[in-house]
C-alpha cells in the first residue's frame, strides 16, 4: 500500500521553502524532495516585491511537479501570521432529545457560529478550543458523547485575500491544480505544543528573520495572534549600522556572540573572503542585547494587548531562526520578561532545529488534512 504523500510550501519572511514528504515511523517524516529560494520577504501584511515572489513560487512549484513526475495535484501553502487574523466565537446547538453527537453535528456547530466579517478575508482553518455538553462536561472531541445540547468555544483563522491573490495564481500558472492555504501559526501550535499543555494554555513565539508572531493557544485552537515587524534580521541590521559593515559579515559576527559566558579576549575575528576583520566583543554584545531588549518590549506589548491573564508558570515557547541560535539569548529574554523561556523545535532526528519548525508543522497538518 502506497503511503500518503503531500507537498507544502512555507512562505517565510526571508525565503520560500517547498517540501514533499510522507509519514515515517515514530512520528517522523520521510522527505522526498526539498527546494528553497530566497526573496525579499514581507512586513505589515505586504510583500516587498510581489513580482519576485511570484517568480520564486513558480520556480519551486516547477521543482515539485518534476519531483512528483507530473502527478502533483494539490499543494498546501502556509500562511504567515502577518496575513491572518483570528476570530473567536461561542456557539450552541440543541437537539429534540438526548442522542449521540455526530461529525455532522460538530460541523453544524461551526457553521452556526461563523459569518465572514469582511470581504477582504477568506476562512482557511477552524478548530475548537473546547466543547461542552448539557451536563457541563468539557471535551476535546464530543463525537460519540450523548447530550441534548452541544456548546463550543470555537476559533476561526482568516487569510488576507491579498496573500491568496499573490500566491495562488503563481502556483496555478506553474501547473498546480489545487492550492490549499493553512495557518502556519495553527500548524506550529498543534505540532510543537503537546496536547496536555494546550488544554491549559500555551504561548508560542515564532521569531523569524523580519517578523515575529505571538500566538496564545488553548485546546486545538488559537485564541490570540499578533505579528510585529521585528526579527533576527533587525539584530543583524543593528550590527551593520554600528560598524558600517556588509550584511553577511554582520550575520557572521552575530553568530559568534555568546551572551552567557565571560569573555577571555577583547575582539571577535571575522573572515570576509581573503580579508580578516576584528570587532570589540563588548560593543558587539551591547548591540545584540539592545536589540533583544527591543524584541522583548514588543513581546510584552503584544501579550498585554491580548487581554489574557496568563499564569506565571506558563513558559514562553520560542521557535524560528531569528534568535534561537544566539547563545545566551534565551536566558536574556527570560530575565527581561521575568518568565521561563523554552526553545522548541521538531522532535525529528536530523531536523530537530527551530528553523525547521514551520515547514515540518505544515507537513504534519497537511498530512492530517489529506
Model-derived regions: residue spans:
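Short, contiguous acidic/charged loop-to-helix segments that flank catalytic cores in large enzymes
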Residues: 286-287, 317-321, 345-353
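Generic beta-strand/beta-sheet core signal
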Residues: 78-80, 184, 207, 217, ...
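Acidic-glycine-rich active-site phosphate/pyrophosphate-binding loop
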Residues: 30-31, 207-211, 327-344
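Acidic, glycine-rich loop-and-beta core segments that form the ion-binding/anion-interacting portion
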Residues: 193-261
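Nucleotide/phosphate-binding catalytic cleft detector across ATP-hydrolyzing
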Residues: 1-15, 19-202, 222-223, 260-289, ...
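Glycine-rich phosphate-binding/hydrolytic loop that grips phosphoryl groups
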Residues: 342-370
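A short, acidic, amphipathic alpha-helical segment used as a generic capping/interface helix at domain edges
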Residues: 294-307
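Extended hydrophobic-aromatic, low-complexity segments
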Residues: 224-226, 236-239, 309-312, 326-331, ...
Amino acid at each position: 500500500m502506497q503511503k500518503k504523500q503531500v507537498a507544502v510550501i512555507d512562505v517565510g519572511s526571508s525565503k520560500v521553502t517547498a517540501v514533499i514528504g510522507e509519514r515515517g515511523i515514530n512520528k517522523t517524516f520521510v522527505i522526498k524532495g526539498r527546494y528553497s529560494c530566497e526573496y525579499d520577504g514581507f512586513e505589515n501584511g505586504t510583500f516587498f516585491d510581489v513580482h519576485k515572489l511570484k517568480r520564486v513560487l513558480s520556480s519551486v512549484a516547477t521543482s515539485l511537479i518534476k519531483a512528483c513526475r507530473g502527478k502533483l495535484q494539490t499543494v498546501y501553502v502556509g500562511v504567515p501570521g502577518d496575513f491572518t487574523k483570528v476570530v473567536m466565537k461561542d456557539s450552541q446547538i440543541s437537539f429534540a432529545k438526548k442522542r449521540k453527537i455526530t461529525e455532522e453535528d460538530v460541523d453544524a456547530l461551526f457553521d452556526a457560529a461563523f459569518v465572514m466579517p469582511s470581504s477582504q478575508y477568506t476562512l482557511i482553518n477552524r478548530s475548537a478550543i473546547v466543547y461542552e455538553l448539557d451536563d457541563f462536561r468539557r471535551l476535546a472531541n464530543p463525537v460519540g458523547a450523548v447530550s441534548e445540547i452541544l456548546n463550543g468555544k470555537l476559533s476561526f483563522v482568516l487569510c488576507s485575500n491579498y496573500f491568496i491573490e499573490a500566491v495562488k495564481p503563481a502556483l496555478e500558472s506553474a501547473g498546480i491544480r489545487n492550492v490549499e492555504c493553512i495557518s502556519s501559526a495553527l500548524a506550529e501550535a498543534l505540532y510543537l505544543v503537546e496536547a496536555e499543555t494546550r488544554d491549559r494554555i500555551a504561548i508560542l513565539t515564532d521569531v523569524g528573520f523580519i517578523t515575529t508572531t505571538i500566538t496564545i493557544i488553548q485546546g486545538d485552537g488559537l485564541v490570540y495572534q499578533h505579528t510585529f515587524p521585528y526579527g533576527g534580521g533587525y539584530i543583524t541590521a543593528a550590527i551593520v549600522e554600528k560598524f558600517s559593515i556588509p550584511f553577511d559579515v554582520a550575520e557572521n559576527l552575530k553568530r559568534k556572540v555568546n551572551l552567557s559566558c565571560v569573555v577571555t579576549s577583547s575582539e571577535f575575528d571575522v573572515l570576509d573572503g581573503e580579508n580578516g576583520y576584528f570587532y570589540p566583543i563588548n560593543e558587539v554584545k551591547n548591540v545584540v542585547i539592545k536589540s533583544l531588549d527591543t524584541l522583548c518590549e514588543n513581546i510584552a506589548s503584544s501579550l498585554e494587548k491580548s487581554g489574557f491573564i496568563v499564569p506565571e508558570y506558563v513558559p514562553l515557547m520560542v521557535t524560528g531562526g531569528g534568535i534561537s541560535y544566539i547563545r545566551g539569548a534565551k536566558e536574556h529574554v527570560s530575565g527581561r520578561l521575568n518568565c521561563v523561556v523554552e526553545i522548541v523545535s521538531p522532535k525529528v532526528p536530523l531536523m530537530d532545529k527551530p528553523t525547521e519548525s514551520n515547514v515540518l508543522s505544515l507537513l504534519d497538518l497537511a498530512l492530517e488534512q489529506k
